[in-house]
Amino acid sequence: MKIGLGSDPFGIELKEAVKQHLLALGHECVDIGGTADAERPYFEVTHELAGKVGSGECERGVLVCRTGMGMAIIANKHTHVYAAVCEDPSAAAKARSINNAIIITLGGMVTAAFKAKEIVDAFLNTGFKSGWDEEAAGVEPVMVHINCSYFNIIRVR
């Protein structure tokens, strides 16, 4: 599987551990940075990776910042991208099977490398539960607002 990886300065070490794990499993990794030699701001890395995953250039993505939360918020602004902060393997599996997440975000300051590898494995080894009742799940009311942003909403008021 072709997996995009990215991190801010707080996630470089964990991203590298995840990358080595994925390469050992035979995955292709597209590392967009940052690195110890070339740190990049979290928002820049997130936009680039979300673009690659949203366009299909990468099948899945893993982003690592201080807590994972900021990158998830930004990634979810991209069309066709569902990103979830995952702090354990069960959450990663549910993010895939129920929410169809294609990017997970991890906290470089709060997630141990061994746990990150378990989380990534659960994420990659779980499929989306297709065939579920979207109407009962309330997907349509959410999709109506898919291109809304905070700024568009406050301008209307």
Regions found by a protein language model. Give the residues of each.
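C-terminal binding/interaction regions
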Residues: 4-6, 10-11, 89-157
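A short beta-strand-loop structural module common to alpha/beta enzyme folds
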Residues: 28-40
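Short, structured coil segments at secondary-structure junctions
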Residues: 25, 78-79, 99
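Helix-adjacent hinge/juxtasegments
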Residues: 45, 49-85
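Residues at secondary-structure transition points
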Residues: 9, 13, 37-44, 66, ...
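Glycine-rich phosphate/diphosphate-binding loop of Rossmann-like nucleotide-binding domains
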Residues: 5-24
